[in-house]
């Protein structure tokens, strides 16, 4: 039993080592200024979607700071302590993020919808399709332009046929976060924006 437990711990450590090496390699090759933080707690309910990370104001973090993982955008810092930060996830029902449809350049806002993102009140004349990839638009200066966000997996048209809505599945598996990237902008961001 003890040998089996040690074997399981070793396998887990090897997997974690591989993930960390991959993240460090990505950080070194990224044009963005980043650092790696570890997720210390997850709080996910139907409407509220947050994680807690092990860095805070003492590490230079700021409210609104973009947070990613290797798969794409996961959220932004919304509560800051000296040695920890709460990150609101992109799927939280109070979160919104400016996006761009990669195929067409259409820009709109994606809203958190529990486990997915929702695009609401998009004119029916807009070219939007299931399978379209959504990236950050760069508007608002919180998220650099072009970061992977989600892919559209369903669409509907309003009863009066003036608007269409879409649901999008995030690229990042938000229920399996262990390590994240914190992104610093090229120019300083003030919290008064």
Where are these regions (language model features)?
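A secondary-structure micro-motif
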Residues: 5-12, 18-193
């Amino acid at each position: 039993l003890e040998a089996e437990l040690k074997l399981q711990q070793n396998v887990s450590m090897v997997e974690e080592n591989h993930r960390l090496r991959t993240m460090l390699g990505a950080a070194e090759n990224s044009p963005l200024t980043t650092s790696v933080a570890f997720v210390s707690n997850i709080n996910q309910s139907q409407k509220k979607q947050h994680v807690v990370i092990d860095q805070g104001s003492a590490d230079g973090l700021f409210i609104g700071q973009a947070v990613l993982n290797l798969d794409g955008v996961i959220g932004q810092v919304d509560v800051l302590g000296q040695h920890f930060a709460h990150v609101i996830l992109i799927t939280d029902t109070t979160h919104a993020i400016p996006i761009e449809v990669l195929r067409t350049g259409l820009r709109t806002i994606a809203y958190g919808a529990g486990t997915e993102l929702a695009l609401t009140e998009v004119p029916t004349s807009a070219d939007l399709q299931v399978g379209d990839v959504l990236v950050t638009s760069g508007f608002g200066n919180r998220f650099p332009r072009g970061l992977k966000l989600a892919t559209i997996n369903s669409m509907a048209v309003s009863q009066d046929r003036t608007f269409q809505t879409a649901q999008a599945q995030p690229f990042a598996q938000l229920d399996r976060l262990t390590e994240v990237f914190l992104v610093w902008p090229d120019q300083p961001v003030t919290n008064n924006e």
